[in-house]
UniProtKB/Swiss-Prot annotation:
EC number: 6.1.1.14
Catalyzed reactions per annotation: tRNA(Gly) + glycine + ATP = glycyl-tRNA(Gly) + AMP + diphosphate
Gene source species: Thermus thermophilus (strain ATCC BAA-163 / DSM 7039 / HB27)
InterPro entries named in the record: aa-tRNA-synt_IIb (IPR002314), aa-tRNA-synth_II (IPR006195), aa-tRNA-synth_II/BPL/LPL (IPR045864), Anticodon-bd (IPR004154), Anticodon-bd_dom_sf (IPR036621), Gly-tRNA_synthase/POLG2 (IPR027031), Gly_tRNA_ligase_bac (IPR022961), GlyRS-like_core (IPR033731)
Protein name: Glycine--tRNA ligase
Any GO BP: glycyl-tRNA aminoacylation
Subunit (UniProt): Homodimer.
Family: Belongs to the class-II aminoacyl-tRNA synthetase family.
UniProt function note: Catalyzes the attachment of glycine to tRNA(Gly).
GO terms, molecular function: ATP binding; glycine-tRNA ligase activity; protein dimerization activity
Positions that bind substrate: 99, 189, 236-240, 360-364
SUPFAM superfamilies associated with the record: Class II aaRS ABD-related (SSF52954), Class II aaRS and biotin synthetases (SSF55681)
Keywords: Aminoacyl-tRNA synthetase, ATP-binding, Cytoplasm, Ligase, Nucleotide-binding, Protein biosynthesis
């Protein structure tokens, strides 16, 4: 049975060292989390699986690691400086601040009906309601108060301010002088670093269309109301691909990447019934998108976006390129007066220059971790009436691949053998192997069930040739316990390597 609530997952993550509140000893920093010993392993395993699939296993992909600090002009011409904002509203009574669309989603149906009527918007179209409210903020604030919009913190109707936009980018300054010339930003997405490096990568690799550039990295958004644990946070990590194609082939490649990403998430252990493709209607599309399909996941807190696959057309390269007019670029935020490079592709057959279209699969690493934990969390009743919690993670993603456990910790022959075996298994390169000498084998099994360790290897008296029957026939054999079935088998240590490699290698 899965986790019944997000609180249950949060408690497990803290108790077992997956994820902690950042700066907790000083009251915590809202919307910021630290990954603990097991969390960092799970997160890295997910990222490595993504990189292996999309970079190493493909012949049409290159990698990139662009800087977090971003030149102001990059985000000026991308449109972020002017438009990367969320609608915000305050309750004068509680002094609480909320993102408007999130606040409205939590309202009772009768409250929303009154608000739709007050703003003269067709019922059921929340996107249109938010747009209407932002176009008439004074009227909207009064309508919210009159309609009895509830404050989630108090559960009572609020006295609401007119909504306004809040830019979510974190500003900083490069160098010792904090003036306009030194202004820079912490990147709000990893994508822009790929776009401005398009020509660099193209020149360095001599790639031909279609090809992609992949990147994993941190991004920062000053979210108005971070919530739902690591789902919506202010510092997060993205796994993004910008896949460059010829105009006219974009719709094919968009469909291709939607199917490819759905397939990959299932291979990582997410069930198909919990993955819901959602094609955004025209009124929900971002200003740069021709089409977007979101892969939604049934998180403990509800159905929410795990990954988005957008057809961004020529908007991005067209916004950052020089010679926009000569290249026939119309889908741009501003006339670019600063770019020094032509971000275009020369057709090797016709010699004609054009700006490629871009398909962007963009996934949240933190959301992926949360989805994997939610999917894997299982509570089972055992035949003896006891209950166990087990994380049924895909073995290759598990933070600890193998636990090597001496049956007793007061026999040097057994503990030293276990340590040597741990080193031998670690040399296989399959991931983290943990030596643990707690002295209570039953508790060790339960602990490793709870953190998702797929195999526990026990070194005992038989292993060192001191069987109870006085024989040495089981010398150099160990007990291997399976996490999911709890079944135990006896293997010679020389067989153990092949056994584990077969089950843990990608």
């Amino acid at each position: 049975m899965p986790a019944s609530s997000l609180d249950e997952l949060v408690a497990l993550c803290k108790r077992r060292g997956f994820i902690f509140q950042s700066s907790e000893i000083y009251g915590g920093l809202q919307g910021v989390y630290d990954y603990g010993p097991l969390g960092v392993e799970l997160k890295n395993n997910l990222k490595q699986a993504w990189w292996r699939r999309n970079v190493y296993e493909r012949d049409d992909m290159e990698g990139l690691d662009a800087s977090v600090l971003t030149h102001r002009l990059v985000l000026h011409y991308s449109g972020h400086e002017a438009t990367f904002a969320d609608p915000m509203v305050d309750n004068r009574i509680t002094k609480k601040r909320y993102r408007l669309d999130h606040l409205l989603k939590e309202q009772p149906e009768e409250v929303l009906k009154r608000l739709y009527r007050a703003m003269e918007v067709e019922e059921g179209n929340l996107h249109a309601l938010v747009q209407a409210m932002m176009q008439a903020p004074e009227r909207a604030g009064g309508a919210m108060t009159a309609a009895g919009v509830l404050d989630p913190a108090s559960g009572e109707p609020g006295d609401w301010t007119p909504p306004r936009y809040f830019n979510m980018m974190f500003k900083t300054y490069v160098g010792p002088v904090e003036d306009e010339a030194a202004l820079a930003y912490l990147r709000p997405e990893t994508a822009q670093g790929i776009f401005v490096n398009f020509k660099n990568v193209l020149d360095a690799t001599s790639r031909k269309l279609p090809f992609g550039i992949a990147q994993i990295g941190k991004a920062f958004r000053n979210e108005i109301t971070p919530r739902n644990f690591i789902f919506r946070v202010r510092e997060f990590e993205q796994m993004e691909i910008e896949y460059f194609v010829r105009p006219g082939e974009d719709e094919y490649w968009h469909r291709y990447w939607v199917e490819e990403r759905l397939k990959w998430w299932q291979e990582m252990g997410l069930s198909r019934e919990n993955l819901v493709p959602y094609e955004q209607p025209p009124e929900e599309l971002a200003h740069y998108a021709k089409a977007t399909v979101d892969i939604l996941y049934r998180f403990p807190h509800g159905l929410e976006e795990l990954e988005g696959i957008a057809n961004r057309t020529d908007f991005d390269l067209g916004s950052h390129t020089k010679d926009q007019e000569a290249l026939g670029i119309t889908a741009r935020v501003l006339r670019n007066e600063h770019s020094t490079q032509r971000l275009a592709y020369r057709d090797p057959e016709t010699g004609k220059w054009f700006v490629p279209y871009v398909i962007e699969p963009s996934a949240g690493v933190d959301r992926g971790v949360l989805a994997l934990l939610a999917e894997a969390f299982t509570r089972e009743e055992l035949p003896n009436g006891e209950e166990r919690i087990v994380l049924k993670l895909k073995p290759q993603l598990a933070p600890i691949k193998v636990a090597v456990i001496p049956l007793v910790k007061n026999r040097p022959e057994i503990t030293e053998y276990a340590k040597r075996l741990k080193a031998r298994l670690l040399a296989l390169g399959l991931g983290r192997v943990l030596y643990e000498d707690t002295g209570n084998i039953g508790k060790a099994y339960r602990r490793h069930d709870e953190v998702g360790t797929p195999f526990a290897v026990t070194v005992d008296y038989d292993t060192i040739g001191q069987s109870k029957d006085g024989t040495t026939r089981l010398k150099d054999t160990v007990t291997v316990r399976d996490r999911d079935t709890m079944e135990q088998i006896r293997l010679h240590v020389d067989e153990l390597e092949g056994f584990l490699r077969e089950r843990l290698k990608w």
